[in-house]
Amino acid sequence: MENNELVNTNINYSPCILNTCSFGNIINNNEIEIFVSGKNKAKSKSFLHYLTYDFNSKDETQKKETTLLFQTWNETPSKTVNYIIPIRINNSQNESQNSLLSSGAFIFSSQLELLLNNNDDYNLYQIDDDIYIKPNIENDIIYGLVLDIGLKIFDLAKKETKSILYPGRKHIINDYFISSDNKNIIFACEDRKIYVYDKTDGKSFISKPNKMEINQVCEGSNDGKKFYGYSDEDYTLYLYDIRNFNQFVDVVKQDVEITKMFYNKACQQLFFLEFGSEAIISIDSIKQESIYESHKMIKDFGFQEQQKFMNIITEDNSINIISL
């Protein structure tokens, strides 16, 4: 496939409002799993769809779709889900089961249970705080950011939680990510500091205050030694060295707010989306360029890194899949 070749533009959810779309696994060597969360306009119901698509064929009949979750709430949740986490749940023999876990089944509102699906046997936790879920890189482990408190770790195998907190401190955490070597959890907080939690020894490291508050953080290199930080205050991207994260360099200053950024290890580039934009922008150490223009406002994007696929949700609630 040529770069940026359109794989499929016919996955359309026009009667619905889409929130997120993300890739799961590659199955049968030619099919890709896709998770779509959104809300039905007519019925006011939230849903999570699971579908597979044959990326070697452009025939629409090669798409298989099922409803993984269709949950009705008596009251509208205070916030909608922002991220989908496709994880396969392993049993004690480490054999993959057919159960799929996704944050599309999680809701932010207080006093609501976290659900895997409609089966009550899969209720995991009762959460009394607004929770913000992001993708994790470990089987059976979920990292959830609990606003105004800290980071909670949900262990699905043990069905228990623990909090990562710094003694004597309360934190409002803007964003975090887990390093590619699975060693560190990096936090960006409203106090303009960056915190690094070493999972192997439980030690914590705290930076000096930055000039600007950092609102988003993500991986910055394949070796896990660098990471990006972004500030809404001055619309600037910063690149940090995790070995001495008080040192950083300005990467680029934007004219408008960045709403989402993602470091793609396969492409070794940072991809980001500006507010109200119709294009996905990529950046490396040499140049910044627009890699996809939809001519429609883009709501969300994600990657399947093994095959270098990117999915894009546009304002008309359709999903576009391109090959990078």
Model regions: which residues?
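Beta-propeller domains
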Residues: 2, 35-71, 113-114
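Blade-level signature of beta-propeller repeat domains, shared across WD40, Kelch, NHL, RCC1
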Residues: 299-324
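Short loop/turn segments that connect beta-strands within beta-propeller blades
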Residues: 54-56, 118-120, 156-159, 199-202, ...
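Short coil/turn segments within WD40 beta-propeller repeats
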Residues: 41-48, 112, 148-152, 191-194, ...
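Residue-level detector of Asp-centered blade-edge/turn motifs that repeat once per structural unit
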Residues: 25-30, 88-95, 137-139, 180-181, ...
